Each structure stands twice: as C-alpha cells, then as structure tokens.
Design a protein with these regions (language model features):
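Aromatic/hydrophobic pocket-lining residues that form the small-molecule binding cavity
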Residues: 60-63, 87, 112, 144, ...
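Short, surface-exposed alpha-helical recognition segments that flank or form part
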Residues: 54-55, 78-81, 161, 229, ...
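Mid-domain alpha/beta scaffold segments of enzyme catalytic cores
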Residues: 6-154
Length: 245
C-alpha cells in the first residue's frame, strides 16, 4: 500500500521506485544531496488537511538507504508542502540521521522563539517560501518578511520556490530579503524558451546583481519537456535542461 494512515495517493502521483540504478559517476567525498523530502509515513506523520496533493509514503529509512545507494554522504531535507507547517516528519529524519542531515522548515509567523530554537537544535538551517500557486495557498509578503527577520539572527537562509514567469512580480520582495537566499530548481525556467531569451536573462540578472542569492541546479525531471534517456534515447539526458544549468 503506497500511502498509510487512511490517506489515498493522488491519482498520477508516482509510486516509490524500489530499484534505482547505481550511478556510474563516483561522487566526491562529502557530497551532499541538497534537496530531498520525506513523506509521512501517513500513519505516523499525517499529511496536512490543506495539502494540494497526497504522495506515496517515503520514510526517513528509505531516504537514508537511497542516500547510501547513490553515494551521497549527507542530505538537506526540505519540508514537503503536503505536510504544511507541521515539520515533525522532517525533524524526525534529522534526529535519526546521525549528524548527516540538515533541514529546511516551513513556519508561520506565530511560531514561538522556543520552537524556532528547537528546530535549530534539531538541525534546521533555513525556511522555505513557496510561490508555486498549484502547491500552496497565498501567504502575505509582510508575514514572510517578518519570518525572515526572525530567522536571520539564527544564521538561517531563505529558500524560495517560484515559476520563472512570476519573477518580475516577486523581484522587489526577493531582493528585500535580509538573509542568504537559495533558489529552488534554477527558478523553474521554461526550457522551451531560448536560454538567451528575456525570461532567463532576468533570472541571471537576479543572480549576478545580488551576491546573497544562490541557486540549486536541481530537478531536471520536472523542468524537461524532451525527457531523460529512458523516455526517448536522447544522449546525453535532459538535453533541453542542460543549457540552463
């Protein structure tokens, strides 16, 4: 059963894949998987009532086994939107990672200083602000700025997740953030557009003009239109994403 706790997996959501291949590339010593999630299990860490999707369960033990199989030494476990601001599943993974994981949380403005400190003690080092409309409900920007100012003294960073088409609207907010800023998935570029076109040029300017902004080069499987080798025998894989990376 892919999802426990009386939850039903959203139609079309992938099941857990039990047979991943081992990479031919040997990762360097200290390699970190900079973006991964744990989902539930639903019978232990229920999914949020306001979630936009229900995934298959993907526990911390499955994550750690995959980490070792792929050759990573550490993980950055990012709070999944299906858990809302209930960070228990993510924190549980950090506490059982034997010092090999850090976390990125989702919090609301009413979180206490004590609870922020407890997240820090567990290994959380950032918060995620999600602007992908199909995944989350709107949060007022003044609330997010308040959160950013509260986590700054802890030395945390802010992770931002957005669609490339929304960058012009979000520019002033992003550039006002007082912390280090980490962009998820290269700002989700539309890879059917020219890499030297105006949309990606704006993202490049966002990066170059703001030294506190960094980007994760991640998630080609969500960005690609052409698909990986397994889908169309393209060599190398993700040929439409590579120019943007």
């Amino acid at each position: 059963k892919p999802t426990s706790g009386g939850f039903t997996k959203t139609n079309g959501w992938l099941d857990w894949y039990t047979g991943p291949s081992k990479p031919t590339l040997k990762l360097p010593t200290g390699a970190v998987d900079a973006h991964c999630h744990v989902f539930g299990p639903g019978d232990t860490f229920p999914y949020a009532p306001q979630r936009k999707y229900t995934p298959c369960d993907a526990s911390k033990d499955q994550l750690f086994a995959l980490r070792d199989h792929l050759g990573f030494e550490r993980n950055v476990v990012v709070q999944a939107t299906c858990h809302g601001s209930d960070n228990r599943a993510m924190v549980d993974a950090l506490l059982h990672a034997n010092g090999k994981a850090r976390g990125v949380a989702t919090v609301t403005r009413d979180i206490s200083d004590a609870d922020l400190q407890a997240l820090h003690d567990a290994g959380v080092r950032g918060v995620r602000f999600n602007f992908v409309k199909r995944l989350v409900d709107f949060t007022p920007k003044e609330e997010l700025i308040e959160i950013a100012n509260r986590i700054k003294p802890l030395g945390w960073h802010v992770v931002i997740y957005f669609e490339a088409v929304d960058l012009p609207e979000l520019w002033d907010f992003f550039t006002a953030l007082p912390t280090t800023v980490v962009v998820d998935h290269m700002g989700r570029p539309d890879v059917t557009q020219p890499v030297d076109g105006p949309e990606f040029a704006l993202f490049e300017r966002f990066m170059t003009e703001h030294p506190n902004v960094w980007s994760k080069v991640t998630c080609p499987e969500r960005l690609s239109v052409s698909g990986p080798k397994a889908l169309n025998d393209a060599t190398p894989t993700y040929t439409d994403v590579v120019p943007f990376a």
